[in-house]
């Protein structure tokens, strides 16, 4: 799910609309809006229906100009995380971006950005969860960051890494970062991190909280 407050103070709560208890159940994307701080909510609004394909892991980002970006993954019909393949053709995960300029009342048609944000060797990729951010300070002020994760390898050699989708033009074009480093000084990536969230701290540093994809420790924090 993704929950944001727009520049006009409207609450937008968006999530997967599931018909079955399954991550990949031909999910739609559905939304409710609140203009009174959450005391009352609109009727359920269908934002995106991909037919038998599945919409997963929606992430909204509120931009300084009031636009709301919606980033989500599209999995082929009946294909789960372990069943999609690397690359950009065939049975692959795809990534799409929509936007709203009226506080979520209407939404644009989706723009596919898969080749911009998906590493070619990644077997599966997805976003979030939660919300993206737009940097408020520093040399990259205005940059949009969406937390993402990638699954690389096969069988017992599978690893997951956190990274970010990056836009410097308000979401028109994107590129992706390298995997987030572990921070031990050896340049190695932060291993086995899947769903993650990003915030910008008051001193300009970025903090990421991530879910451990396997192992005894459920969550990690990275500065």
Which residues make up each language-model segment?
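Asp-box/BNR beta-propeller blade signature and adjacent active/binding-site loops
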Residues: 1-223
């Amino acid at each position: 799910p993704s929950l944001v407050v727009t520049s006009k103070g409207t609450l937008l709560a968006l999530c997967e609309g599931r018909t079955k208890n399954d991550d990949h159940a031909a999910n739609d994307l559905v939304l409710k809006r609140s203009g009174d701080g959450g005391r009352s909510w609109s009727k359920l609004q269908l934002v995106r229906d991909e037919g038998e394909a599945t919409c997963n892991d929606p992430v909204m980002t509120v931009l300084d100009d009031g636009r709301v970006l919606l980033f989500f993954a599209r999995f082929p019909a009946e294909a789960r995380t372990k069943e999609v393949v690397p690359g950009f053709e065939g049975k692959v995960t795809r990534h799409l971006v929509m936007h709203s300029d009226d506080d979520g009342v209407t939404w644009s048609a989706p723009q596919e950005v898969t080749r911009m944000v998906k590493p070619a060797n990644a077997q599966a990729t997805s976003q979030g969860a939660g919300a993206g951010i737009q940097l408020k300070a520093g040399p990259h002020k205005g940059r949009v960051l969406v937390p993402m994760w990638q699954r690389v390898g096969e069988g017992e050699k599978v690893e997951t890494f956190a990274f970010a989708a990056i836009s410097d033009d308000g979401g028109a074009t994107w590129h992706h970062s390298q995997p987030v480093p572990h921070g031990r000084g050896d340049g190695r990536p932060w291993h086995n991190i899947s769903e993650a969230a990003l915030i910008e701290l008051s001193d300009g540093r970025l903090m990421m909280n991530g879910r451990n994809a396997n192992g005894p420790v459920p969550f990690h924090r990275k500065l």
